[in-house]
Every structure is written in C-alpha cells, then in structure tokens.
Amino acid sequence: MGKLLRHFLTLRDFSKDEILEIINIGLEIKKSLKSAVCKHELKNQTLAMIFEKSSTRTRVSFETGMFQLGGHALFLSNRDIHLGRGEPVKDTARVISGMCDMIMIRTFEHSRIEEFASYSKVPVINGLTDSYHPVQLLADYMTLVEYGMEKNIIAAYVGDGNNMTHSWMMLAAKLGFELRVATPKGYEVDEKILQEALLIAKESGAVIKVTNDPSEAVKGATVVTTDTWTSMGQEEEKEARIRIFNGFMVDEKMMSQAASNAKFLHCLPAYRGLEVSEEVFEKHSEIIFNEAENRLHAQKGLMVWLDKQRNI
C-alpha cells in the first residue's frame, strides 16, 4: 500500500488544482481513446460497484471505464451482498476493501458512505448520495472545458435543492465562478452545505446566490442547468411537486433571459414537459449527450488520479 489514501466523497475535500488535474487526465484519456490508443493504467485492478440506488449512467460508465483502463468491475446490489441484509457497514467495508482495489458506492444517506470510507483500505468513490453527486460535476465541468466555456462562468441552477445543487455549489466555491440557485420555497438547498460553500467561496472569490425566483437566477447566465423534480425515494411526492414546481420548467422563454450563447446542461434522465421543455432539450441535445458520455471519461480520470495518489 502506498503512502496516501484518498477518497472521493465530495468536492469539498479537493483543491481547485486537484479538480482541474482530474479533469485534464480525463480529457487526455478521452483523446487517446478517440485516436484508438488505450493505456491500461489500472491493469488487473478490480472496482467493486455497490448499488443501493439503481442507475443507468453510473453503472455503464464505471463498468466500461474500468474495462477500458485494463481492469475489471464487479456489480453488487443489495441482493448480492449482506450490506442490504443487516451486516454492519464497517464489516462490509473491511471485507470488500481487502479483496478489491477501489470501491464505488451509490446509496442514500451520505453518512453511510462516510462510514464505509472510514473503514476502507482502498479509495471509495461517491457514485451518488442524497446529499452529493460529485462525479456528475466532474463530467459537467469537463464538458464546459471542451466547449470553451470554462472562463467567466455564470451558472444558473433551476429546480430542486438536491444533491446536484449541493455539488454545483461546491464546484463553484472551489473553482471560483458565479452560481445562482433558484428553488421553490420549502425546497431550498441544505443550509449547512450552503454555509460551507459560502465559506469556501470567500477564499476563492466565487459568488453563490440563492433565490426563489428563476428569472433572477437565469438572467445573463452562460450555463443553465436543472435536474428531476422528484428524486429516487420521493415518488409519493411526485404529484405535489409537479404543482409546487410550476414555473420552474426551463423552457424557451426562460432560456431567452440567459446570455445569447448560453448552454443548457442536464445530468439525465430528463423528464420533458416537467423540469425542461422538449424544445430546449432537443436544441441542446448535442452538449447534453456529450455531457453524459463525459461521465465515462471524467470517472476514468478520477480513478487513475486516485490510484496515483497511493503511489506518491
């Protein structure tokens, strides 16, 4: 085992330079793949993928990414392991980390992945929790870099104050750009996470604003983004949320208030006619699906970076 064990649980734990280094590694790997030059930088390594929440993009991107890097990915659902049947998190962590080289977890409570990481002997990656979705933000920022939009970012997030919103706040705080968040009353971001982001923003020069007015958030924005109004586990609230979020759909009228060259991002799956209109989604479909593909490349950059830290 090398000298340094780093986990990727939230962007809060990473410096600006580290985030940019991970992005750059991902971009280089993507470039190499497109030119049919694959470096097996994780040859013979095994990634354990624990899914307590199901996903299309997370499983496909991590499994494909590990294969392209020369390694193997092992899919584990609650039905496959004792973690879903009462075994203590700390026991599962010690067992799996003794057999695998890296672990990705997609789960509910953020405290669950924090406990797992505290007992793991190998890097743990947050594939999504109720509080954060940091791997998605790596892909989002990589996409902005590819489109030459990383300078003077003014980002607007319109919708639910959820894990995506929290991760956007951390990215803005770390990289020093402006982020405006618009949510309905009662669906604001977590106050503790907001205060943490604002504290970091003081050092980086970032500007983070929260409002209940979508127009205030979107005006002049260079990037507009949203997420589903009803996350996994909130299905019983769906009809109520649709009523409450009325006026928060990103449509052509809302996008017309953004900068003339503004781009729209969505982490997917997208529910057209709810958080985004069919017209806006299709108009920006090229960048959206490039953003989706970049989950693969950004996560490869992350896994390579985490592996290198063990050998410093």
Curated annotation (Swiss-Prot):
Pathway: Amino-acid biosynthesis; L-arginine biosynthesis; L-arginine from L-ornithine and carbamoyl phosphate: step 1/3
Reaction(s) catalysed (UniProt annotation): carbamoyl phosphate + L-ornithine = L-citrulline + phosphate + H(+)
Entries under Pfam families matching the protein: OTCace (PF00185), OTCace_N (PF02729)
Compartments it resides in: Cytoplasm
GO terms for cellular component: cytoplasm
Residues that hold L-ornithine according to the record: N163, D227, S231, M232
Binding site for carbamoyl phosphate: S55, T56, R57, T58, R106, H133, P134, V135, Q136, C267, L268, R295
Biological processes, Gene Ontology terms: arginine biosynthetic process via ornithine; citrulline biosynthetic process; L-arginine biosynthetic process
Single GO term (MF): amino acid binding
Keyword line: Amino-acid biosynthesis, Arginine biosynthesis, Cytoplasm, Transferase
Role of this protein: Reversibly catalyzes the transfer of the carbamoyl group from carbamoyl phosphate (CP) to the N(epsilon) atom of ornithine (ORN) to produce L-citrulline.
Official protein name in the record: Ornithine carbamoyltransferase
Species annotation: Sulfurimonas denitrificans (strain ATCC 33889 / DSM 1251) (Thiomicrospira denitrificans (strain ATCC 33889 / DSM 1251))
